[in-house]
């Protein structure tokens, strides 16, 4: 791939801002709104922020790690950037779209690149009913919470909650409970990526629940619908020797 106009964006850390200054001195660059590729300098959190920021542009984003976690980032090097971009492999992600309805009647809609999670707000456990494509699959789940993860997000919160790591292109999503009390032995499910999942919050007044799509939170929800948004393409670029598919496989063999 040959790119004619590059933009740089950076997290608000000293390391990221210092890298930004050096790279902008070294390479011709334009404003992000005019670029045909964006270089994101930071960690995974900043990469998610950048993907959300430019979601309507479908501009490829190439991350370089200047943060603490860099699963979604390439190795930081200042030299040879143009050549690296020309050899980079493209990964297209489709985010989840969350539609949440709160107790006050407010409708909250947001995209999630990693996962949509439902979490109890108080000492009371959450009590949920789960519908998949209109059919009740679990009439009552008592838990601290539950999440629906994309393949790209399966190594994040999902993995910490003991959910499965999913290869890119598998065409599935992970439904993973968080500290399930009843049914105690339920460990979640793998769903087709086309599935529409609806969570109904039972006893919502007594057991308040929040819903979070990446970093957009809705409090006191009573119903949450989640499904993949195939109309939204998020384009990421990775070095061939360390692409996202390879990282997901490697993550499964870490000690």
Curated annotation (Swiss-Prot):
The terms under GO molecular function for this entry are:
ATP binding; metal ion binding; NAD binding; NAD+ kinase activity
Give the record's family classification: Belongs to the NAD kinase family.
> What reaction(s) does this enzyme catalyze?
NAD(+) + ATP = ADP + NADP(+) + H(+)
Q: What does this protein do, in the record's words?
A: Involved in the regulation of the intracellular balance of NAD and NADP, and is a key enzyme in the biosynthesis of NADP. Catalyzes specifically the phosphorylation on 2'-hydroxyl of the adenosine moiety of NAD to yield NADP.
The subcellular location is: Cytoplasm
The active-site annotation reads 44 (proton acceptor)
**UniProt EC number:** 2.7.1.23
Q: Which GO terms describe its biological process?
A: NAD metabolic process; NADP biosynthetic process
Q: Which residues bind NAD(+)?
A: 44-45, 114-115, 144, 152, 155-160
Give the gene that encodes this protein.
Answer: nadK
- Which Gene3D superfamilies does the record match to this protein? Probable inorganic polyphosphate/atp-NAD kinase, domain 1, Probable inorganic polyphosphate/atp-NAD kinase, domain 2
Q: What is the protein name for this chain?
A: NAD kinase
The primary site where this protein sits is cytoplasm
Q: Which HAMAP family match?
A: NAD_kinase
Record's keyword annotation contains Zinc: no
Which organism does this sequence originate in? Paramagnetospirillum magneticum (strain ATCC 700264 / AMB-1)
Keywords attached to this Swiss-Prot or TrEMBL record, sorted alphabetically, are: ATP-binding, Cytoplasm, Kinase, NAD, NADP, Nucleotide-binding, Transferase
**Cofactor(s) needed for function:** a divalent metal cation
- One GO CC term, this protein: cytoplasm
């Amino acid at each position: 791939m040959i790119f004619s106009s590059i933009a740089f964006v950076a997290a608000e850390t000293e390391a990221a801002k210092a890298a930004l200054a050096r790279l902008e001195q070294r390479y011709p660059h334009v404003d992000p709104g005019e670029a045909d590729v964006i270089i994101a300098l930071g960690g995974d959190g900043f990469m998610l922020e950048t993907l959300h920021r430019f979601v309507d542009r479908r501009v490829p984003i190439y991350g370089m790690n200047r943060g603490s976690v860099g699963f979604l980032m390439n190795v930081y090097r200042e030299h040879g950037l143009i050549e690296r971009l020309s050899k980079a492999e493209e990964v297209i992600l489709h985010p989840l779209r969350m539609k949440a309805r709160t107790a006050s009647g407010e409708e909250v809609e947001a995209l999630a690149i990693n996962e949509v999670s439902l979490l109890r707000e108080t000492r009371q456990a959450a009590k949920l009913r789960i519908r998949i494509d209109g059919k009740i699959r679990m009439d009552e789940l008592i838990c601290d919470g539950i999440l629906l993860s994309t393949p790209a997000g399966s190594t994040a919160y999902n993995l910490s909650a003991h959910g499965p790591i999913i290869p890119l292109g598998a065409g599935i999503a992970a439904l993973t409970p968080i500290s399930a009390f009843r049914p105690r032995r339920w460990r979640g499910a793998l769903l087709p990526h086309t599935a529409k999942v609806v969570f109904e919050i039972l006893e919502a007044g007594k057991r308040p629940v929040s819903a979070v799509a990446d970093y957009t939170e809705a409090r006191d929800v009573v119903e949450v619908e989640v499904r993949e948004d195939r109309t939204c393409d998020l384009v990421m670029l990775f070095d061939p020797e360390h692409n996202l598919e390879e990282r997901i496989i490697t993550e499964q063999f870490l000690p």
